[in-house]
UniProtKB/Swiss-Prot annotation:
It comes from Cupriavidus pinatubonensis (strain JMP 134 / LMG 1197) (Cupriavidus necator (strain JMP 134)). Its main location: membrane. Catalyzes the formation of phosphatidylethanolamine (PtdEtn) from phosphatidylserine (PtdSer). GO terms for cellular component: plasma membrane. Heterodimer of a large membrane-associated beta subunit and a small pyruvoyl-containing alpha subunit. Pathway: Phospholipid metabolism; phosphatidylethanolamine biosynthesis; phosphatidylethanolamine from CDP-diacylglycerol: step 2/2. The keyword Lipid biosynthesis applies. One of its GO terms (molecular function) is phosphatidylserine decarboxylase activity. This is Phosphatidylserine decarboxylase proenzyme. GO terms for biological process: phosphatidylethanolamine biosynthetic process. The gene is psd. Belongs to the phosphatidylserine decarboxylase family. PSD-A subfamily.
Amino acid sequence: MNYPHPLIAREGWPFLAGAFLISLLVHASAGFWWALPLWIITLFVLQFFRDPPRPIPAQPNAVLAPADGRIVVVEKVQDPYAGREALKISVFMNVFNVHSNRASVDGKVEKLEYFPGKFVNADLDKASVENERNAVVIRRAADGQIVTLVQVAGLVARRILCYTKVGDSLSRGQRYGFIRFGSRVDVYLPVSARPRVTIGEKVSASSTILAELDEVK
């Protein structure tokens, strides 16, 4: 499995180093019991920024989950970023989920659009249109179908990181972004896509199949 990233995300290294050093200093000067709450915080930071490799399903028409979390939306809507009717599937990430974002399909980035906004609870439907967000529109390499991935900031998450640009080619499971401390990813698919998940279901980035696309003849 080719996943060329450290098991602890680079985005978390400064936080982890700071938490570790403060815990160590308090431990050395005041003892273990005074430092215990700080060590617990350090362990929380460590688990929050974990970024493990994941197996990728072989089905060529599968759309993979872009993030770990829980399904909160499966419905037909308008895709405001690609201007079409679409099937929308949303993944809500709480603070205990892995927060790296990974490409759902193989394809080329056709459009990248950032929107400033609010920071309401990402579990709410209005977060998709009111919160700070970053949309990546991907045209599938195999058949030209469009898949839109939208990183949505949450109540605690105030920083969306996106590492791709227009013209880049992405592979399924490729890491393309990160959102800190609780957030959401909206996935807009062709309206003919067949959902493979239901509301409330827990999913894993790159491993869970969200939907299957029809073959384009």
